[in-house]
Amino acid sequence: MTVLAVVLSGCSGADDGDESQSSREKSTNPGSSAFEPPRLETKATIGNVEGRIAAERRSRVKRDVTEIVDAWLDAAYVAGDFPRTDFDDAFPGFSSGARDDARSDAGLMSNQAIGDRVESVQATKRRLRIDVLATGKKAVGVTARFVLLMDLELDSGSDAERSERVAGSLFMTWRQGGWQVFGYDVKRGLA
């Protein structure tokens, strides 16, 4: 598995228009008690591809990997009710070993360290570049390089409003019928 990680680190929604009137009113009326800013969509691209893979499969890899990364970013940083202290489900799509590591790094890999002080979180940038390792015309590994910028409003103190940047790489492989994060290299700090 170490060899795969080294190789990978070297790699560089549909809208059907059937939205109900009440849901449109909630999403567009700031006076509504159910108002939430629209979710910022992740801008994802395929980066370097080592090996051969058909365009159709590239599109599928892009879609599937973006879903895994989005699920983690939402669960760990930007979605859910705040303030909160429960981040048990913050690592969807992670292997059991990577999930254990991420829980040990919870202040880096989620908002757990400040979750009880967070009043609101708004993502201002979500970017993803997916480098692919393919063999036999199939993607077998990816390095998902991401950037998340978010504005946080905390309950009090000199840092009550601040912008943070979380960026790095998630190393993924195809396991049990889907992409799974087996390792990461992530940094977090003020934006």
List PLM regions with ranges.
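Juxtamembrane and targeting peptides
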Residues: 2-71, 77
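A general secondary-structure boundary signal
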Residues: 8-10, 64, 88-91, 167-169
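Structured catalytic/translocation cores of nucleotide/phosphate-coupled proteins
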Residues: 11-17, 123-125, 160, 179-181
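Short, charge-rich amphipathic segments
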Residues: 14-29, 42-43, 95-103, 144, ...
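Core segments of small alpha/beta cavity-forming domains
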Residues: 44-117
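A short, amphipathic edge element
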Residues: 110-134
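Exposed beta-sheet edge and beta->alpha loop/turn motif
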Residues: 133-191
